[in-house]
Amino acid sequence: MTALTRFAHSRSSWFLLTGTAIGLEAAALYFQYVMKLDPCVMCIYQRLAVFGILVAGLIGMTAPKYRLIRILGASCWAVSATWGLKLALALVNMQNNPSPFATCSFLPEFPTWMPLHEWFPAVMLPTGMCTDLPWRFMDVTMAEWMVVVFSTFLVIWLLFIVPILSGSTKPSLYK
């Protein structure tokens, strides 16, 4: 078993994924409440995608020695990172090519059975506009940084998918 496979089968790899997502969620709340940067609806959707990566890490952390658990975690990771990248690219396009006809909505379009913006308004209620560019770091906007973040999550997923899918050297039906 290679070192990468051993790491993918360990709790620490999934803990690292979870910790990274928690750090990103904490940074989002810092930007919102300390720096007073209002999140737009696309930002809220990206926040939800990061939460999906957090859930993926928690799934993988429960029992990383079992292939089925690793596959469930990796699937959630891939879907969330892909969806987040799609949203981040759409937001970058919206900010780089502003149009009065192509704006984002004021309220998120969550399912009626799961109105997260009503249940958790402090975290999931958008208060900003998608075309606002209030913050830059190294001349890169927050939306562009999120493209980097979600792309990195996907590249790491690509590096880990084969070790995640591989079984352990111990004979077992589930490993």
Swiss-Prot record:
UniProt GO BP: protein folding
Main location as per UniProt: membrane
**Membrane spanning segments where?**
14-30, 49-64, 72-89, 145-163
Q: Name one Pfam family in it.
A: DsbB
- Stored SUPFAM superfamilies: DsbB-like
Cytoplasmic domain ranges by topology: 1-13, 65-71, 164-175
Could you list which ranges are Periplasmic topological domains?
31-48, 90-144
Q: Which cysteines are joined by disulfide bonds?
A: 40-43, 104-130
Question: Localized where?
Answer: Cell inner membrane
- Keywords per UniProt: Cell inner membrane, Cell membrane, Chaperone, Disulfide bond, Electron transport, Membrane, Oxidoreductase, Redox-active center, Transmembrane, Transmembrane helix, Transport
Organism in which the protein naturally occurs: Shewanella sp. (strain W3-18-1)
Q: Cell membrane among the record's keywords?
A: yes
- The answer to whether keyword Ribosomal protein applies is no
Protein's membrane topology: Multi-pass membrane protein
Member of which family? Belongs to the DsbB family.
* Gene Ontology CC terms, in alphabetical order: plasma membrane
* GO MF terms held by the record: electron transfer activity; protein-disulfide reductase activity
- Output this protein's name: Disulfide bond formation protein B
Q: Which InterPro entries match?
A: DiS_bond_form_DsbB/BdbC, Disulphide_bond_form_DsbB, DsbB, DsbB-like_sf
| Protein's job | Required for disulfide bond formation in some periplasmic proteins. Acts by oxidizing the DsbA protein.
